[in-house]
Amino acid sequence: MYRALHPSLTIRQSDIHGLGIFAATDIPEYTILGISHVAEFKHHRYHCGYIRTPLGGFINHSNDPNCIKIKMNDDGSYSSLEGIVTSATMAIETIKEIIKNEELTVRYTIYSLGGE
């Protein structure tokens, strides 16, 4: 049976922005929480991608995230999600233990323009 969200997750109001993804239970480090899609959006002024699934659509940004985005390869393996991605299936994985009611976050920036 398809579930839009991992059973350990819920969507609710976020102090960061709008709605967010929260842990409904404690979640161990290195848990893959599900997939999200980055789809090509050619009609935008700046050729870019967007995420449109409950997991990808509601997870908020943090400079100190507790999750990372990893690319799902065609053979079912995973690899680092680096650079500008315009079409991919990605998974969200925890990089530290997450306690019940904690908001899950990822770093939106996958590249930097000057400076840091």
Located regions from the model:
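Conserved catalytic SET/PR domain of SAM-dependent protein methyltransferases, capturing the structural core
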Residues: 1-116
